Structure formats: C-alpha cells, structure tokens
Amino acid sequence: MFIDTSELCDLYAEQVDVVEPIFSSFGGVSNFYGKVTTVKCFESNGLIAEVLEENGEGRVLVIDGGGAVRRGLIDAELAQLAVDNGWEGIIVYGAVRQIQQLENLDIGIHALAPIPVSADESSAGESDIPVNFGGVTFFPEDYIYADLTGIILSQEPLDLED
C-alpha cells in the first residue's frame, strides 16, 4: 500500500513524532510501514541476523547502530533474509553495504550511509528495548511509517484509508 508521510503528518499532527531527516533510502521499496521491533548493537550484526530469521510480516526492524558508519550492519544477504521472512522494512541508524543489490530487493531500507566494510558477526547487543536516535524514542510495538520524504512514528496504528 502506498503511504505518504507528508499527508499522515497533516492528518495526525498531534499523534506522530517525526524522525530528523538524516536517512537515505537504499532498498527496492520506497515506502513501508509496520510495527516496530528494535535491536541495539555496535558494528556487529549477529543479533540482527537472529531477529531477521523471525516472521517479519507487518514488522519493521529498527536498528540502533550508534550512528556508526565504519561498518555496514545490513548487507545483501541479511536483506534477502528479511525479504524471505516477510519483513516490511529496516531502519538503520548506521551504515549498509552492497547497495546495488539492496536496491533490487523487495524491501524498504533506510540508513545513514553506505560503506563497503562488513560488520563483525558477533551477537553482541540487545533486542526489544527502547532506542533513541533522530530526535525520537522508538519503543517496541510502536508503529513506523517511512517514504522518500521522511520517517514518522506513532504509538497507535494510523488509519491509512483517510
């Protein structure tokens, strides 16, 4: 379903938080939404892989990578795993790699920057905890909406039929 974050902000101005405009789109889907699942890690993606193995239908993975852009937390293999398991999208407060492959996958991916260096594969980090970046706090079970214009967050699902 097509979403327009600008229109959603107009309709739900008092209900949504707007993430600072620091992200670029790298996936093959330009707009996506779903229930938030969080991971907090630093330059390692083992825990990300574990979470992406879960059923992702109706879910968006929000990764707090500390804003580090020295290693790509999401690569083509992890993005394909997300597609295979039905994830709607991935937001990375950090870097991604293999962007030529990412843009051909049927998933939304927003991140700070691309870099060719891979993350280590340790499972260090935490999941399903509140994470804070971009001027907002993301809680597991919040709802996130993203398009090429921006990313917004709501505690309740928004009516997309308006």
From Swiss-Prot:
HAMAP family: RraA
UniProt gene name: rraA
Protein name in the entry: Regulator of ribonuclease activity A
Gene Ontology terms: cellular component: cytoplasm
GO molecular function: endoribonuclease inhibitor activity; enzyme binding
Disulfide bonds: none
GO terms of biological process kind: regulation of RNA metabolic process
Tree of life domain: Bacteria
InterPro entries, per the entry: RraA, RraA/RraA-like, RraA/RraA-like_sf, RraA_gpbac
Short name of one Pfam family: RraA-like
CDD domains associated with the record: RraA_family
Cellular location(s): Cytoplasm
Family: Belongs to the RraA family.
Function noted in UniProt: Globally modulates RNA abundance by binding to RNase E (Rne) and regulating its endonucleolytic activity. Can modulate Rne action in a substrate-dependent manner by altering the composition of the degradosome. Modulates RNA-binding and helicase activities of the degradosome.
Keywords from the named record: Cytoplasm
Upper taxonomic lineage: Bacteria, Pseudomonadati, Pseudomonadota, Gammaproteobacteria, Pasteurellales
Known partners and oligomeric status: Homotrimer. Binds to both RNA-binding sites in the C-terminal region of Rne and to RhlB.
